[in-house]
Amino acid sequence: MSFPRAAANHPFRVLAVLLAAAVGVLLPGPRAAAAAGGPSLAEGTSVGIHNTYGDTAQFPFLADALDTGASLIELDTWVDPFTHEWKVSHANPLGNKNNCVDAAGPADLYRGGTNKDLGSCLDDLRIWLGAHPGHAPVMVKLELKAGFDATVGLGPAQLDALVRTHLGGAVFRPADLLGGYPSLDAAARAGNWPSRAALAGKVILEAIPGTFEQSNPFDHLWTDTEYAQYLNGLQAAGAIGQAQIFPSVLGAAAGDPRTRYPDASLRQWFVVFDGDAHAYVDGGVDTSWYDTNHYLLVMTDAQNVTPALSDTAPALADATARVARLAAAHASFVSCDWTGLPAVLGEQLQRGQ
């Protein structure tokens, strides 16, 4: 199904709330406001492509992947301490291997040399969205393969600066969800997400710990924790608006997986969760908890849920049914490698149904 476009913003909403408070009139909360413009970001399910940058046979250019209608792209990035760049590749920490180009306008998205850095990939996304203003919001999943390295000027603040430079106002930031609430958790549970229609053409970024980082016995400060600590610092400094990224809790687990963070003050920043679809669905995890609290849930490897489907080329009917099943299982975003099925990649479903 497709979602209707958002209704125009109402400049008198704040005044109305103040007047209502004065006279004791109960007004609709944020969820009702989102409903007026269609399902909120947390009330829908979209589909995206695992390692979107890497399949250059199917997608010679990143724009080709976006042309499928996908609403999630994944970019693996490495910090390069020698060039001070954010490299994009699956396995080379010192080189770029991807389908991103140096584009200055829409016509450049499908030509020129590839294998560019993260800034160029974000430029490609921004330019493509500018040419497709009605496109559903896109989740950019950043896997920081080896984590941050603030000691060489490649920490959370520098990544935020890069995002601001290359995506500008296209980003839906943590501060945009936060509003007047004391924490992201409180804002999410109150349903303060805008409608998906209102977020058309926007980007939401999540950051997860990388595979190399997780296997590094000398790395004791993973991406999720480091970025959450950074958010704590920004909030204390009254500068939370600088943050561009939502840190994500990685890995399916029963209950509230944020209890893994010993510093309880960090847990408030995690309203995005990311894990294996098979572990969530076949593992008996109560995923309704995420939906009830309006948290975003990214389910990866959709093909591995029982019964397993082809990794890359399932039948259209099977893939469509699988996405519907994961939407019913409360996924916000479904990640897969079904690059040849644009009818599936472009789906926008109601979450939890």
Task: Enumerate the predicted regions with their spans.
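Bacterial N-terminal signal peptides
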Residues: L15-L26
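Alpha-helical protein-protein interaction elements
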Residues: P4, L18-L19, L159, W222
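Catalytic cores of phosphodiester-bond hydrolases, prominently lipid phosphodiesterases
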Residues: A36-Q353
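Bacterial N-terminal signal peptides that target proteins for export
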Residues: S2-A16
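C-terminal region of N-terminal signal peptides and the immediate post-cleavage residues
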Residues: G24-A36
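Initiator methionine at the very start of the polypeptide chain
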Residues: M1-S2, A34
